[in-house]
Structures are given as C-alpha cells and as structure tokens.
Swiss-Prot record:
Originating species: Aspergillus oryzae (strain ATCC 42149 / RIB 40)
PROSITE patterns the UniProt entry points to: PX (PS50195)
Protein name, entry field: Sorting nexin-3
Gene3D superfamilies according to UniProt: Phox-like domain
Pfam families from the UniProt entry: PX (PF00787)
Family listed: Belongs to the sorting nexin family.
Higher taxonomy: Eukaryota, Fungi, Dikarya, Ascomycota, Pezizomycotina
Membrane topology classification: Peripheral membrane protein
Subcellular location: Cytoplasm; Golgi apparatus membrane; Prevacuolar compartment membrane
Designated gene of the protein: snx3
C-alpha cells in the first residue's frame, strides 16, 4: 500500500509573497530624436528583479536600436553555447510611423525577455546586466 502525502494549505506568504526569483523586463516609451537624416528612435528598458546577477532591483535605461544590434553581437561572441534570438528586422520605409515603432518595440521586448531570462546568460554574460541596467553603457567598451 502506497502512502498518500499529506496535503496542506499554502500560507498567505506563499500565495501572495514575492516569487523566489523574478525578472520583469519591459521595453516602453519610444521617443524619436533628431531631424531629417539624423533621426532615430530610442526605447526605455525597465527592469525589476531579485536575481543576484543583476546589481539593481529596479532600473530604467534608454537604448536605441543600434545599441541592441551591438549588444546582440557582443552576446553572440561571448556566449558560443547559447543561440541568441534575432532582433526584429531593419526597416527602411516608414520607420518612424507609429505602427513600425510599436512593432519594433514589441520585438525588442520579446528579445530582451528571452535573453535576460536565459539561466546561462544570467550567470555567464558580462554584458547582459550592464546593457539592461547601466545608464552609461558604452558599446565601445566591449
């Protein structure tokens, strides 16, 4: 005869307390800067976490698409065992339209959520936390 494990009610803290490890990444608030040929869009990256690999529990930084491209290239070079997902594609027409900017914002958020949520990258990447949390991140420092 097999023993039936005792069941118990979860405590209030178990139900409503913070999860053991959590990571929330949001890409929001796109802003277009410059004029004419020098225009570009930047995006706010908001991170909330209690994962030790990230120095700050809450951070907000701003990055442009080209920063994401450099970041992805650096990740690929430093993390040969992990397949880094693609970024949303380059856009050459109407790239400052609301629809295009929103589509890109969604793609950048999906990219960061996948990358930041990967356990090997959380523990092994030197650039990950810096890109997501350091307002003075410099693509040329890597």
């Amino acid at each position: 005869m097999q023993a039936v494990p005792e069941s118990r009610q979860q405590t209030f803290e178990e139900i409503y307390g913070p999860p053991e490890n959590f990571l929330e990444i949001e890409v929001r608030n796109p802003q277009t800067h410059g004029t004419s040929r020098n225009m570009y869009t930047s995006y706010e990256i908001v991170c909330r976490t209690n994962i030790p690999a990230f120095k700050l529990k809450h951070s907000v930084v701003r990055r442009r698409y080209s920063d994401f491209e450099y970041f992805r290239d650096i990740l690929e070079r430093e993390s040969t065992r992990v397949t880094i997902p693609p970024l949303p594609g380059k856009v050459f027409t109407n790239r400052f339209s609301d629809d295009v900017i929103e589509h890109r914002r969604e793609g950048l958020q999906r990219f960061l959520q996948i990358v930041a949520g990967h356990p090997l990258l959380q523990t092994g990447s030197k650039v990950l936390a810096s890109f997501i949390q350091d307002p003075n991140w410099d693509r040329n420092a890597w």
